[in-house]
Regions:
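Beta/alpha (TIM)-barrel catalytic core signal, keyed to glycine-rich beta->alpha loops juxtaposed to Asp/Glu
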Residues: 93-269
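Conserved, mostly hydrophobic/aromatic
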Residues: 3, 31, 44, 57, ...
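N-terminal binding-site loop/beta-alpha segment at the start of enzyme catalytic domains
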Residues: 1-55, 111
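Short, acidic/polar
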Residues: 11-24, 66-81, 131-141, 210-216
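Acidic (Asp/Glu)-rich catalytic clusters
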Residues: 24-25, 45-54, 74-83, 114-116, ...
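Short catalytic-loop micro-motif centered on adjacent basic/acidic residues
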Residues: 29-35, 58-60, 122-127, 226-228
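A short, structured active-site edge motif that brings together acidic residues
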Residues: 54-65, 87-91, 151-153
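Active-site groove signature of glycoside hydrolases
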Residues: 77-100
């Protein structure tokens, strides 16, 4: 399990403190934040003086050029109150033109490699959203030996035949090369559309504990994948509780029944 610290994006210090206790209670030792996540890095930074050794710390840059990515990353270190992080990720490399810039000469990747050479970063990863991201991650791995990828994985997404095919191809390559496969959007119910936003997630999430159990157990039932938690503090206890009870992987019939019962729909089409 990975704590998706986007959940702290709008949190005050007094709201963030109980989250740390929750992470320690459930033994969650991987924090994933980003320069773009509002107050998140600063909130995580308040924990680092006394708890840096307890966590694998990951952040992201959304910049595409060397100088901007370098500057943004160094500001992240300041906000996080650390000398180094474990993982720096190039965030949301989906659009081909941005991909070419970030991974080309003078691109953000050069800043990440420099940071690793300077001992500021141990690993370099790439993240993204949407139906083409699995294919784009394969392309990224052809260009550079990234240590990790991050992308959506849930039942509605995997009912998209092309996405499922690309995801499986990516999973094969990751397994062969020892690339960490991090997944997001695990408890997505459907897009908000015109419905009232009742959570901080940018999709409508599953909220019933039994439904969250099925969704979380389905993701964690796949070997060699990590599950990143949703960007809403109120959902964390339910997700952590589900993960702590993970056992047998739900059957296809159980998951299809969940899809139909809750009218689940893919976030990306």
């Amino acid at each position: 399990m990975i704590f998706g610290a986007a959940a702290l994006g709008r949190a005050q210090d007094e709201e963030a403190a109980p989250i740390l206790e929750l992470l320690l209670e459930y033994g969650i030792n991987h924090i994933d934040t980003a320069a773009m996540y509002g107050r998140s890095e600063r909130r995580v930074g308040t924990w680092m003086d006394s708890h840096r050794k307890d966590f694998f710390l990951a952040t992201k840059t959304g910049e595409r050029t060397y100088q901007k990515a370098r500057d943004q990353f160094h500001h992240s270190l300041e906000r996080l109150r650390v000398d180094s992080v474990d993982l720096l990720q190039l965030h949301n490399l989906v659009e081909p033109a941005e991909w070419e810039t970030a991974l080309g000469p003078g691109g953000a990747l050069e800043a990440a490699v420099e940071a690793r050479e300077q001992g500021l970063v141990r690993f370099i990863g790439v993240t993204g959203h949407g139906t083409t991201i699995a294919a784009m991650h394969l392309r990224s791995l052809e260009r550079f030996p990234f240590d990790s990828v991050l992308l959506p994985y849930n039942v509605p997404m995997m009912q998209n035949a092309q996405y499922a095919s690309d995801f499986e191809a990516l999973a094969t390559v990751c397994a062969e090369r020892g690339v960490a496969m991090q997944t997001i959007k695990g408890i997505t119910l459907r897009p908000w559309d015109e419905r009232e936003h009742t959570h901080d997630t940018w999709y409508e999430p599953l909220t019933d504990q039994a439904d969250i159990d099925l969704a979380v157990h389905w993701v964690l039932g796949r070997p060699n994948v990590f599950l990143n938690t949703a960007a809403d503090m109120s959902l964390l206890p339910s997700v952590f509780d589900a993960a702590s009870r993970a056992g047998d992987t739900p059957s296809d019939a159980e998951m299809q029944a969940l899809v139909e019962r809750r009218s689940m729909a893919p976030l990306f089409t």
